Amino acid sequence: MKHRHLTCFFFLTTIAAQAQVEEEFYRNKQLRLVISAGVGGGYDAYARTLARHIDRHIPGNPSAIVQNMPGGGSIKAANYLYNVAPRDGTVILGSHSAISTLPLTAP
């Protein structure tokens, strides 16, 4: 029984420390939601709704903007993320569901 309490205490303190690290990382940062669709469509509407509310759910309350990058069946946006975007967790891709099968069906 004593070991169980000690394990729970260790687990809870680890979670609290992780949340503090994330809050420090995202404080005063800007998230960019790269959407592989044009302005005014369904994906754009979802992304803009998410951008308005995401700051309340990420420690540090980062702001969020939407960047539309249509073209190539999501490949243009995916290539941007892979080749250009910073790899620090501040850029998120929102793509069509076909992006995973496109290379298999249209080589």
Predicted region positions:
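Hydrophobic h-region of N-terminal signal peptides that target proteins for export
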Residues: 11-19
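Conserved hydrophobic/amphipathic secondary-structure segments
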Residues: 23-107
